Amino acid sequence: MERITTNFRSSSTAAEVIEGVDLSGKHAIVTGGASGIGFKTTKALCAAGAAVTLAVRRPAAARAVAENIRVSTGNAAVEVRSLDVSDLASVRRFCADWTGPLQILINNAGIMALQDLHRTLEGWEMQFATNFLGHFALTTGLHAALVAA
């Protein structure tokens, strides 16, 4: 078996990883795409030509981020949509509202361990619901769109 290697390291940026890749005509969703790693990922995808949907808990705050990305990348195809991956009803709505094919799904949103026990409305532990269950539901809910691409 041949070992797979890469020149990328822990210090590599999203822009370095995607350099030379043309994503024109591709659509991506990035959960938590308005901050942190999600922001850098969204910006790199847009710079490579992808249309990107920022799926975020706070759409009002994300709109300014989306505008920043539009201006800095020259890519106007950045939209913001409400999604709380810890809330399965929100995930179901997001999936039901999605139209068209989807080539890229970046399940980025996440939370760190909480000091106290917090549960979702459905009774799930918050970190499990956010970091695993919601993304599993999102991926399975968007499966048809991913396959259509």
Could you tell me what each predicted segment is?
Residues 38-39:
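N-terminal Rossmann-fold NAD(P) dinucleotide-binding loop
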Residues 59, 80-93:
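The beta1-alpha1 cofactor-binding region of Rossmann-like NAD(H)/NADP(H)-dependent oxidoreductases
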Residues 27, 34-35:
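Conserved glycine-rich cofactor-binding loop
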Residues 114-129:
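Short alpha-helical oligomerization interface
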Residues 1-29, 96:
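Non-catalytic terminal and boundary segments that flank Rossmann-like NAD(P)-dependent oxidoreductase
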Residues 48-64:
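Conserved glycine-rich Rossmann-like NAD(P)H-binding loop of the short-chain dehydrogenase/reductase
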Residues 35, 104, 110-113:
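Flexible cofactor-recognition loop at the NAD(P)H-binding site
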